[in-house]
Amino acid sequence: MLGTADLDLLWVCTPPAAHAEPAIAWLDRGLPLYLEKPIARSLDDASAIVAAAAGSRAVCAVGYQWRALDILGDARRALAGQTVGCLVGQSVGGTQARSWFLDNAAGGGNLLERGSHQIDLARALAGEVTAVQAAAASVRLAPRTGPAGDIDDAVTLVLHFEAGGLGTIVVAWTSAALPGSYWVEVTAPDAAIRLDLDPHFRLSGVSNGAPVAAVAQARPFDRSVDRFVAAARSGAPDLVCCAPGDAIATLAVAAAAEEALASGQTVPVSCLG
């Protein structure tokens, strides 16, 4: 279909393990591509997509929508000139149990579906991650109406930031009857801020003795798409909120977390990819 269809742009929403083939084919045509996160299931596939994007004239965006928060700039300014010492993020709530979501090989489960959003936001606020520790609960939190799948319902990550700080990310898939909880808190020497995420999207806290407060004026998903469309129309790739080169860095942290889950060890991010 991609070879013959008269399309203006492509939005790849396949399971992550099936991202590479359509993404690379479309980039080779030189036409705009919006690629749902994560960029791919494996670092090899992600590297191939990044290479295709680098060699293409096409605009390419990856759907880490929290990057598109209009109050993310306010949060960064509150932390400007400071080193983040502690970051804590939580993404807990129900989600649609698509068959590939329950298949770790196809989708990566909670770690990629939810955790990579938090990893990406942590990188945006606290800088690059050099090593990861991880643990998963054996408790089933979300009911299954079909196959149980092979994913972990609850995962906790410890991120070691290049600048010296630590981050903790808690991710869990729960019953849809329970309230969701999505937020991140960041502490630096002269700042303590909180970003409430879905569904409120607001910033609060203190920076250098002054209160910090802001409310998002647009939903980040809508803003991410709007920025992509503007980039595609103008041919200005810098307008996209998350480019492939940034998305693969988030995937590298998630891949290290997967290795940490399997080994029980602290895994350097640099040893993967």
Where are these regions (language model features)?
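A general structural signal for well-ordered alpha-helical segments in protein cores
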Residues: 19, 23, 46, 72, ...
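Rossmann-fold dehydrogenase core element
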Residues: 48-65, 83-89
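A short helix->loop->beta-strand "cap" motif at the edges of active sites that frequently abuts
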Residues: 29-31, 56-58, 165-166
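Contiguous beta-strand/loop segments that form the cofactor/metal-binding neighborhood of enzyme cores
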Residues: 120-200, 225-236, 273
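C-terminal helix-rich "cap/oligomerization" subdomain common to oxidoreductases
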Residues: 9-12, 58, 231-273
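Predominantly a Rossmann-like dinucleotide-binding segment in NAD(P)-dependent oxidoreductases
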Residues: 66-148, 264
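Beta-loop-alpha module in the N-terminal Rossmann-like domain of NAD(P)-dependent dehydrogenases
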Residues: 1-50
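Active-site loop of classical SDR/Rossmann-like NAD(P)-dependent oxidoreductases
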Residues: 195, 215-226, 242
